[in-house]
Amino acid sequence: MLTATPLPHQLLATFLLVLASATQPAVPASTDRAALLAFRASLSPPSRAALSSWSGPLSPSWLGVSLHPATAPAPSVTTPSVAELSLRGLNLTGVIPAAPLALLRRLRTLDLSANALSGELPCSLPRSLLALDLSRNALSGAVPTCLPSSLPALRTLNLSANFLRLPLSPRLSFPARLAALDLSRNAISGAVPPRIVADPDNSALLLLDLSHNRFSGEIPAGIAAVRSLQGLFLADNQLSGDIPPGIGNLTYLQVLDLSNNRLSGSVPAGLAGCFQLLYLQLGGNQLSGALRPELDALASLKVLDLSNNKISGEIPLPLAGCRSLEVVDLSGNEISGELSSAVAKWLSLKFLSLAGNQLSGHLPDWMFSFPLLQWLDLSSNKFVGFIPDGGFNVSEVLNGGGGQGTPSESVLPPQLFVSASVDTVSWQLDLGYDVQATTGIDLSGNELCGEIPEGLVDMKGLEYLNLSCNYLAGQIPAGLGGMGRLHTLDFSHNGLSGEVPPGIAAMTVLEVLNLSYNSLSGPLPTTKFPGALAGNPGICSGKGCSENARTPEGKMEGSNHRGWLGGWHGENGWVSLGAFCISTMTSFYVSLATLLCSSNARNFVFRPVRVEY
């Protein structure tokens, strides 16, 4: 499952505030100056040193201080009052000095994020606040019920990445004016409050992020009543039960992330009502049933992640209507049948993973013909027949059209930017899907046979290629050495024969090579990977290479941990990619694969699937 980047996996929320001036009467600047000096005095000595510029008359030269412009000349007001206080990332320590802050009666924005402030959340903050950001500190305890009532004008509240642990009170309810609420990356337990917004019918809430906590119980139906929502993040909790069908009433919703919970039932057909949805992530749950054909109404959908569930059945043809899809991850399910021609209509695809399902049949001719394709993973299925030798020249990135070193920005995994504004508040989300920038193809752990197509090794932009644990036969194409960007190559556990192409020695960026357990012969073209050819009895090394020479069995070099689809176990550990990859292949299966994939059987075995656009 692919997860959202955590940031690394997962998600970053940044609030960009453009706030109108408050209309409250001016307060003498001397009061604000005294309040700021009292605030500084309440901090630890090292923290005070960070605010050494706070001396002399109150002015914009004070670090982190923005002032209201003077409205009219008056002898009693020599300088404006404080409008914004932004002390982000100054390593401030201690408890938030709320009493001095409460004296800043025209303060609109308070940003104390990315410090080391501790203690509990205060309630005695300026009632004039429109934006409060206390994220990335060491605050503990609970979100007090007095906080919303003490800040009636608040539009954005960010308390993410703290140590808040106590359950939210069922009476906790925020005012309808609130536009963005981020409580993510804490350890808050208990149930989600049934009415997190006091007046959902008149709510201005755009963003609700409760992800990466310990919330349990069902998703409250009241969330579906907040019709203004554009981003709903409940991922990485312990939520259970069905997905509320009422979520389909959120017609403004652009991002829905319920991944990594314990949700059950089926994917509700009502989600088709979220016709503006760009990002749908339901992976890592216990969802079952078939894919809903009604989802074809999501014509704007760019990211669809239903990985690691129990979804069964075939990929329905109506999903061809989702023509904007760029990232599709259906891996780790129980999807069966042949590849649907609906997939062929997703011409904007950059990432496609159907790994770890029960898909069968032949790989269609159009499988490699997506013009923007960057990553294709069909591993650990039941595909049979030959790898189609066509369509390899279509994808710009896989053919090296993105420049040297890394693919061009236009074909990297999508960075979705969702923005919205209500009156004077705007916010922006950087939803970088957690897809590695590597370009690659993984067909391991299937029942593919025949020879490796020449067109496949002509894809100069490939950085990762895994065809292991199949029944491939014939020689390794000589053009393999021309794949100058390839850093991982695995052809192990097949029936390949002949000599290893000498061009492998010129592949300077190659880090992982596994050609073990085939029927390869001849000399070693390189000594960089001494264990990569284990289980090939015909391989020999050195100038005295003879027919009976053997290379010592070893382990694959240059490996790193790769996760559930196959483990690189240590730097010199054994390699086995694909959940169903067998550790050895007996001579019986090698012979059987060679027979089935012989040139005489080719026309009988291979029946290509053709799709007309």
Swiss-Prot record:
Q: Which residues lie on this side of the membrane: Cytoplasmic?
A: 598-613
Alphabetized UniProt keyword annotations: Cell membrane, Developmental protein, Differentiation, Glycoprotein, Leucine-rich repeat, Membrane, Receptor, Repeat, Signal, Transmembrane, Transmembrane helix
- Grouped into one coarse class, the protein's main location is membrane
User: Which interval of the chain is the signal sequence?
Assistant: 1-28
Q: In which tissues is it expressed?
A: Expressed in ear primordia, vegetative apex and young leaf tissues. Barely detected in expanded leaf tissues and not expressed in roots.
Organism encoding this protein: Zea mays
Gene disruption phenotype: Fasciation. Flattened and wider ears with irregular rows of seeds. Thicker rachis of tassels and increased floral organ numbers.
For membrane topology, the record states: Single-pass type I membrane protein
Q: Which residues are glycosylated?
A: N91, N158, N249, N393, N466, N514
Name of the protein in question: Leucine-rich repeat receptor-like protein FASCIATED EAR2
